C-alpha cells in the first residue's frame, strides 16, 4: 500500500496521468511458485517480465516513444551474471513455467527479445536510463523524493514489494550466498559515494531481520496459496542456475552483440 501511495503521490505532484496494469493473479502466483520450485536466483523474473511488458504495451497504446527507467550505473553498475540471468530469455522462462507450473498462461504478458525488437524498431519506443546522464547520489535522491513528492521509505531496496524484498534479502542470501548489498556497495564505492571500509562494516550484519522474515514467510505462503510447511520445503530445495535448464544464452548473446556492432553501442551493462 505504501508503494502504491508513493506512485500516486508522485503522479499527482508532477501532474502526470496514472494508469495501473492488473495481472491475472492465478497465473502470476503460479509463475512465482514455478520459479521458486525451479530453485534459481531468478525467482523474481515473473515480476521483471510483467513490468517490461506492461510498460511497453501501455506506451504503444498511447503513442509514447520514451520509457524512463531508474536503472543506473551509480548503484547497479556491477552485477555478476549468475546472480540474475537475462529475464528476456523466453526459452528459459517457458521451460520453467511448463516444468514447474500448473496453470496455462493465457493472459500473462510475456516479453522476449522479439517483442523488445518489435517495440524498439516498429513502434519506435526507447528505454531511457536518465540517471546515467546526471550526477546521481542515492541518499540525496531519496531526500528529494521525501521533501518534494511526499515519498515514504519502505525499509530497503526493492521492499516496495514484500515478495521482491524477501527474495533479495533472504532467499538469495540463504540459498545462494548472494548478498545484493555487495553489488550496490561495489557500485557506490566506484563512484565515491561510499568508502570500502564502510561497505565492509555494513556487510557484517545480515541483510534481513529474523523476526521480520518469519512474518514475511507466513504472508507470502498465504498469498501463494501454500502452507507454511510447503513453502519452507520449497525454500530449502538445493539451488540451481540458469545453465541447469534449457536456455538461449548463445543465441541471445549473438543477437545482442550483432545489434551493438550495427548501432555502434558499447557493451557496458544491461543498461
Can you say where each PLM-predicted feature lies in the sequence?
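Nucleotide-activated chemistry modules centered on ATP-dependent adenylation/adenylyltransferase
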Residues: 1-271
Amino acid at each position: 500500500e505504501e508503494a502504491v501511495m508513493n506512485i500516486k503521490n508522485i503522479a499527482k505532484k508532477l501532474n502526470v496521468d496514472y494508469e495501473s496494469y492488473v495481472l491475472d493473479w492465478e497465473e502470476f502466483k503460479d509463475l512465482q511458485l514455478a520459479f521458486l520450485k525451479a530453485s534459481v536466483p531468478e525467482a523474481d523474473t515473473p515480476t521483471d517480465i510483467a513490468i517490461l511488458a506492461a510498460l511497453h504495451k501501455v506506451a504503444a497504446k498511447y503513442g509514447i516513444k520514451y520509457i524512463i527507467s531508474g536503472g543506473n550505473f551509480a548503484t547497479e553498475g556491477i552485477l555478476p551474471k549468475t546472480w540474475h540471468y537475462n529475464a528476456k530469455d523466453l526459452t528459459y522462462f517457458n521451460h520453467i513455467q511448463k516444468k514447474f507450473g500448473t496453470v496455462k498462461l493465457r493472459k500473462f504478458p510475456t516479453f522476449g527479445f522479439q517483442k523488445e525488437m518489435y517495440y524498439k524498431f516498429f513502434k519506435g519506443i526507447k528505454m531511457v536510463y536518465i540517471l546515467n546522464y546526471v550526477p546521481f547520489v542515492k541518499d540525496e535522491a531519496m531526500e528529494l523524493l521525501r521533501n518534494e513528492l511526499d515519498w515514504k521509505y519502505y525499509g530497503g531496496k526493492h521492499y516496495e514489494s514484500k515478495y521482491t524484498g524477501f527474495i533479495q534479502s533472504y532467499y538469495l542470501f540463504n540459498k545462494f550466498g548472494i548478498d545484493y548489498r555487495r553489488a550496490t556497495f561495489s557500485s557506490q564505492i566506484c563512484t565515491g559515494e561510499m568508502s570500502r571500509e564502510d561497505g565492509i562494516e555494513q556487510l557484517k550484519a545480515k541483510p534481513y531481520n529474523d523476526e521480520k522474515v518469519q512474518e514475511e514467510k507466513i504472508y507470502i505462503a498465504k498469498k501463494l496459496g501454500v502452507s507454511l510447511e510447503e513453502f519452507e520445503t520449497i525454500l530449502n530445495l538445493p539451488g540451481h542456475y540458469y545453465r541447469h535448464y534449457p536456455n538461449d544464452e548463445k543465441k541471445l548473446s549473438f543477437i545482442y552483440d550483432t545489434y551493438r556492432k550495427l548501432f555502434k553501442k558499447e557493451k557496458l551493462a544491461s543498461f
